[in-house]
Amino acid sequence: MKTPVWVVKSVVPQENDTLLLTFADGKKRLYDATPLLDCPAFQPLRDDSVFKAAKVERGVVVWLDGEIDIAPEHLYENSVPVQ
């Protein structure tokens, strides 16, 4: 079975609450997490040290040992291509 294109292969936290993502299709995209930070579930990400600790587990970006995650489909659909 083919891996869906929206599966995250790598994440590199950037400045200004953005994430540089590489997806299963090999494309790099930039996601701005700023709008999420007002939601109570994502408020811990306001701490820069927490935000910068993003990692990929089973194709999903997570923080705090999986306490916080963002659906990979959302990341793909709401990010912009990076040249």
In which residue ranges do the predicted regions lie?
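Motif-centric detector for short Cys/His coordination patterns
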Residues: 1-83
